[in-house]
Amino acid sequence: MVTRGAGQNSTYYGTIADIVLSQKYATPIGRIVTPHYPREATGPDLNQIMMGSEGTFGVLTEVTLKVFRWQPENRKRFSYMFRDWETAMAAAREMMQCECGYSSVFRLSDPEETHLMLKLYNVDETPLAPLMDKLGYKDMERCMFLGFTDGEKGFSKNVAKNIHRIARRYGAMPMTGYVTKSWEKGRFNDPYLRDTLMDFSVITDTLECSVNWSNMAQVHRDVRAVCHALPNTIVTTHMSHCYPQGANLYFIFITRMNDAAEFKRYHTTILDAIQKSGAAISHHHGIGKMFAPWLEGYIGEKEYGVLKDYFDPDYTMNPGGTIGLDLKPEEKKCLNERKDYR
């Protein structure tokens, strides 16, 4: 909520910013309460101002959310294999701009992530593996696209139908529902591998950013180049949380680290690359303390400071650099280096 998060199904249902009706906060200047109406045109939106404050303006005590009908019987799963990343991105853009509705989960993996997914879900051991090779969907070039649709029966079916139509037009090979079901099965278990890997000094972490379609290829290329600058590093990327205007790019790296200082240096180079490439430094993970040094360079110097002075004049709420509000000048990164891509 206070990090402006987004769930895996946000392409259809929206992010937290789309489904909040009202909030209540306890702040140093008193209670802040917003009314819950479906929409208002009454000046600046206090709901949006408070969301993303990460505890620096006050403590969230209550929230009213929109709800949706849950109709799992209407879900339509899909998965396709594209020959390369560029073609897959073009198809994804067309799917999001064709005015045919959006799927609930919309996930496109780049070649490196596709390679790992096929092994992790044992697709390499099925008849699909030799068939892909025979048809020209080459390893470390091909890209996996998967997801599912939700909603009313006719709507869900029509969205899946149009995704199929566009995917085939861009030369994608239909895969079975096995791939999507395998992803769903391990969706919330795979991240726990992180703790086991750390016992062997192997670190895995994720960084994500919001990108316009016009800049998607460059951000993907530039950030991955920085990630791969560290020897023996696995870097996977997928596109998810998509919109007609762009999407979220999600970078995952796996590498061996000697200590926390090395991790911080590496992490910093990646965030520098994201900021300099013209992407938003966070789509849904928020800012916190780790991303805080880059925030002023992204939104400007005065905006958050003015709000902080009003809601928390003594700076008692969540101190220590959260969203960059009390950082020293020498701690700030990438000032005056933001690029805008329209």
Question: What does each model-identified segment do?
Answer:
Residues M1-R107, C334-R342:
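FAD-binding subdomain of flavoenzyme oxidoreductases
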Residues L21-E40, E86, R221, T255-R265, ...:
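A short, flexible low-complexity segment enriched in Lys/Arg and Gly/Pro that occurs
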Residues I32-M50, K264-G278, G305:
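Short, hydrophobic/aliphatic alpha-helical segments
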Residues K76-F78, T204, K289-L295:
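Short beta-alpha connecting loops at secondary-structure transitions
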Residues M89-T269, A273, S277:
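C-terminal substrate-recognition/cap domain of FAD-linked oxidoreductases
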Residues D110-E112, C242-Q245, I281, G286-P293, ...:
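Small/polar glycine-rich anion-binding or flexible loop at a beta-alpha turn
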Residues G288-R342:
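Activity-critical C-terminal alpha-helical subdomain
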